[in-house]
Amino acid sequence: AELNRRTDEFGGSLDNRARPLFAIIEGIRRECGNDFHVGVRLSPERFGMKIDEIREVYSRLVATGQIDMIDMSLWDCAKNAIEEGWADRRLIDIFAGIDRGTVRLAVAGKLYSAAAVREVLGAGADIAVVGRAAITNHDFPRMMRDNPDFAMRELPVPAQTLRDEGLSDTFVGYMRNWKGFVAD
C-alpha cells in the first residue's frame, strides 16, 4: 500500500496488489502439479503492509487450495504487534489463530533457543524456521533435541567459528554486513 504507488491493474486495491502473487501461484500449480509443494512467505509490519491486509491475503491463499505452507516472517515471534488495534497481541498469536485447514504455518523471527522454538510450536505454528541460530550452530535442531535448554551462540561470533560451522569465506564476508554478527 505505502510502497506500491502503481495506478494500473497491479496497484491501488488489495485485490490489485495481490494479483501477481496469485497469478504466480496459479502458474506454478499448473506447470508443476499437485505433488509439488508450494509455500508463500508473508512479512507483516514491513514494506507498508497492514496486519488486516496480510491476514486477508493469508486467508485467500488458504482458500485457493493451491498452497501447502505459509511462512510468516515475523522478525520477532515473541513481540507484540506495533500496529494500532493489534498492539495487545503477539504476532505469532495473530497469525496462528487464522483457520488454515491443512496448510502448514511456518514462522521465523528470533528463534534463538530451544525454548523459543517450543513456544512458537505451542502457540500453533507447525514449523519453526531458524536462521541465525542455524548459521551459528549448523546442528541447531540436534542440539535442541539433545538439550532442552540449548541456545545459539552469543553474538558476535568469530569468523573462524563460522568457518568451523561450514560457512564459506564468501558467506562469512556476507555475514559481516549484519551489524554485530561477526566479531572480527
Regions found by a protein language model. Name each.
Residues 1-184:
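Flavin-dependent oxidoreductase catalytic cores
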